[in-house]
């Protein structure tokens, strides 16, 4: 269950789920709009369906809003340890929200205002008057034709009634007379019908067959009053039905055709007027529909802006948050902290990460150098005091021992034992003097006095001298050049090489195949001096601290030799690297930067001259 809860929590707040929810919100918003639009067009909105769609839209937007704004409101109302980054995150989200909300609100209000103006313009009173007058003109035209046809029907009926005795028994004359009346009075059709027999007694040439079955009974009954009655059996014609007075159940039907263009115009006018009034009655529905659309668009844009703001905020704030955390660690004294450069893009943030890491490394190195310098300074003071306090009694002890040895050695019976004791005193006194000398040398290491020399010649002489002193060690010297002009303090370089070679010799004590190799290689900007031996090497735990003051693995000495070497090398713009060889032994590499050394010598000369 806990794993399921964690999975659901991560999925609910994932970008994928939020994207799916946004897509669903857009789809349901479209369906809501479509349903309202179709219902409004048909004049019958399905209110239950619209309500369900609106509820679903509301739920989706609420869930989406909660998911998108949860972290924002949580950081806004509940302060946490990331207060600074939360403030920045809130500002960015608020900025994006306002950037979307303000234009959307302005556009929505403007659109609603102009929509109302447009609707008022569409349904202006003048337009209503024009449409109503058009309908009145059409109705007047039809009414006028009906009045004329009514008068014509009365006149024809009267003429036929006057000729009753001539026509009743003469169908041919009846037909001829009816055609004459139709032509004379511009009738499109004239028909005389017998109600009892349901037959046509006479009809004009262009009249179509018509029976009483097509005429409603109430119209026939109404026509019995001998007054014309309108028969609306054909929308393209105006017809009048009237009973002939002198005849028994005989009726006259006359009609005139209406021009098709006029009929089409009347139909179009009536249709437009009906649609106009229908839309006018639904102005409220149109305004509601567009208001809902504007609200949904505003909400959608706001949610999109918030989601975009959250994404952009995470992209910007998370790297800054890591920098803040790293800065807090640095403030608490941890100078080993680094921010992951591979987790950010190669943009300004990436540049900031790289600069931060470089700065922390530089601070760490400076702090380490400061500690070493402070330690060296402290030991320098100690060295001066110790040297002063020890040297004073050592000199008389040494002189007294030498005089005892010269004066009383012949008189002592146990001469060998006496000499042994005195030599032991002298030897240990010399050891103490050497230790004191190292103290003094380290404390008072003078500034280098730069002169030109042949570095190959200097180092070769040192190697040859050490070879004579240690004939049990196989010395070798290799170089890729025969001569190299080098500006340095020759005394200090001699001291460096002697110290390194002595250390190598001491590490070879007890070795059967002792060998020391010195290599010199040059390049365009650097010269490298490498000392290799096949001795014991350095203890792994001391490799990183071998050049620190008073670090040593020997019982004799105070461990300032390599510290002095490092100081001299650095004074000559060099770098000292110490490592163990895979095949056994140690390798010490000195690399001098020739360009930097040349600049330092120039500055040194200017300082001396000035």
Swiss-Prot record:
It catalyses: ATP + protein L-histidine = ADP + protein N-phospho-L-histidine. Residues 314-368 form the HAMP domain. It is a multi-pass membrane protein. The modification Phosphohistidine is found at residue 388. GO terms for molecular function: ATP binding; phosphorelay sensor kinase activity. The keyword Ribosomal protein does not apply. Residues 385-596 form the Histidine kinase domain. GO terms for cellular component: plasma membrane. The chain crosses the membrane at residues 18-38, 49-69, 92-112, 292-312. It is found in: Cell membrane. Keywords: ATP-binding, Cell membrane, Kinase, Membrane, Nucleotide-binding, Phosphoprotein, Transferase, Transmembrane, Transmembrane helix, Two-component regulatory system. It is an enzyme of class 2 (transferase). The keyword Cell membrane applies. Its EC number is 2.7.13.3. Pfam families: HAMP, HATPase_c, HisKA, NtrY_N. Member of the two-component regulatory system RBE_0470/RBE_0312. This is Putative sensor histidine kinase NtrY-like. It comes from Rickettsia bellii (strain RML369-C).
